[in-house]
A protein has these predicted regions:
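Structured alpha-helical segments in the cores of large, soluble enzyme domains
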Residues: 7, 11-17, 264-274
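Surface-exposed loop/interface segments of Gram-negative outer-membrane beta-barrel transport/assembly proteins
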Residues: 1, 35-37, 46-138, 156-264, ...
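Predominantly transmembrane beta-strands of Gram-negative outer membrane beta-barrel pores used
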Residues: 2-3, 10-32, 36, 48-54, ...
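Phosphate/anion-contacting hairpin/loop surfaces
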Residues: 300
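Solvent-exposed loop/turn segments connecting transmembrane beta-strands
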Residues: 7, 36-39, 290-296
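Transmembrane beta-strand segments that form the barrel wall of outer-membrane beta-barrel proteins
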Residues: 28-34, 280-292, 327-329
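Membrane-spanning beta-strand positions in outer-membrane beta-barrel proteins
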Residues: 8, 12, 23-27, 59-63, ...
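Outer-membrane beta-barrel architecture
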Residues: 14-16, 27, 50, 142-144, ...
Length: 384
């Protein structure tokens, strides 16, 4: 009797056009999902636009995607006091018709109407008065271009950026048994983020006689930040039904974080082969990471590999069709986490009698930390 009929709708419209020099496409979609629980629904909106153009040796491609998602309540599932079905099956039983408690207030915003006044909550009260809502927006964009300098040489650039914003609110009214605070509760958080990744490549691929070579040189810029803040009431709400930080009985609890990182890179690769028998690959990369101290911020890591198809050089017995020798030497390095070398106090608010505390980490890291590094070697063979 508590569950409702769920349904999903999906609507989409799209437009596209193709011409002599390029194409264009755009689409808009909306998904609505009505769940089986009261006050359970999800909306998703997606809009995308993109296209490409080509003028002789020059070509471009780009586009953007926007996603929006919002719902009024993400609670109600699972085992425990906040689970609707758990409350109904374990603690209610068949002696009660839950529909008799659809009006879940005895006293508006202060006392819920339920057959159990000690342990668990009215499922209708949970669905409407103990909620966790979210509103999320994200944009993805990309752009790339390529120019064919010569038949065997080209230059390309690519860039992509992502941005998001999210807002979450949690609340429970007074008289909650299984909520966050029986005297009322309100929580709000906001977070935003952005990332960018762009690179430029000069690539070549050429053959002459028995030899073939290809490779590239390029550079990349990666940037990222994330900013978040959250606050919640403490020890209840001073005004029933008023969900605001201003209604907190005691001073609110708050926390915030900010993360930022940038990595600049240059790299290259050279590959050569002779008669499709002998192969050599050499790669090299140098990164500069903002998470490392200035003295060790730049780090270089190369790799070399090669192989020889012996069955192309030597006469093989009848039972051996293919034989290859291979070897490789590789160095990989990676930077540290954000703030690993810039430690700060850990602050807690309203710890005792309204006072805050600040604790410094017990482990102090060196200011000349280097990136993590790993070296690997490989020698092998393959035959059949």
């Amino acid at each position: 009797n508590f569950l409702e009929t769920g349904f999903i709708t999906n609507n989409n419209i799209s437009i596209s056009q193709t011409g002599k020099y390029g194409s264009f496409r755009s689409s808009l979609s909306h998904v609505y999902n009505k769940g089986q629980y009261p006050n359970q629904r999800l909306n998703k909106i997606t809009y995308s636009v993109g296209g490409d153009m080509k003028f002789g040796k020059l070509s471009f491609e780009g586009g953007a995607i926007y996603n929006k998602r919002f719902y009024p309540n993400g609670e109600g599932a699972g085992y425990g006091g906040g689970g609707y079905i758990y409350n109904l099956l374990v603690w209610t039983g068949t002696d009660y018709d839950v529909r008799d408690y659809k009006n879940y207030w005895r006293k508006k915003d202060e006392e819920q109407n339920w057959m159990n006044d000690v342990w668990y909550d009215n499922p209708y009260y949970l669905a409407h008065e103990m909620t966790s809502s979210n509103d999320y927006d994200k944009v993805n964009t990309y752009l790339s271009g390529k120019y064919d300098i010569m038949p065997w040489l080209n230059f390309s650039m690519r860039a992509g950026a992502d941005a998001y914003a999210s807002r979450t609110e949690k609340k429970n009214a007074m008289s909650a048994r299984g909520g966050w605070d029986k005297n009322g509760y309100f929580y709000t958080s906001k977070s935003t983020g952005f990332s960018f990744n762009g690179d430029a490549l000069l690539s070549a691929n050429h053959s002459f006689g028995d030899f073939a070579i290809d490779g590239f040189v390029g550079g990349t810029i990666y940037y990222y930040y994330d900013d978040a803040i959250s606050s919640n009431t403490r020890n209840g709400l001073s005004i029933p039904g008023y969900y605001s930080l201003k209604a907190s009985v005691d001073p609110i609890a708050s926390s915030s974080s900010y993360k930022q990182k940038q990595v600049n890179s240059i790299y290259g690769k050279f590959s050569a082969s002779w008669k499709s028998t002998v192969f050599v690959d050499v790669t090299a990369r140098n990164d500069w990471s903002s998470t490392l101290p200035s003295e060790t911020r730049s780090y270089f890591y190369p790799a070399v590999s090669g192989s020889i198809i012996m069955s192309q050089l030597l006469k093989m017995p009848e039972w051996l069709n293919f034989w290859k020798l291979r070897g490789a030497w590789t160095v990989t390095k990676s930077d540290l986490g954000i703030y690993d070398t810039n430690q700060a106090y850990s602050v807690s608010t309203n710890v005792w009698d309204g006072m805050n505390t600040a604790v410094y980490p017990e482990m102090i890291r060196s200011t000349t930390l280097e990136p993590t590094a790993a070296r690997s070697y490989e020698i092998g063979t393959a035959f059949n």
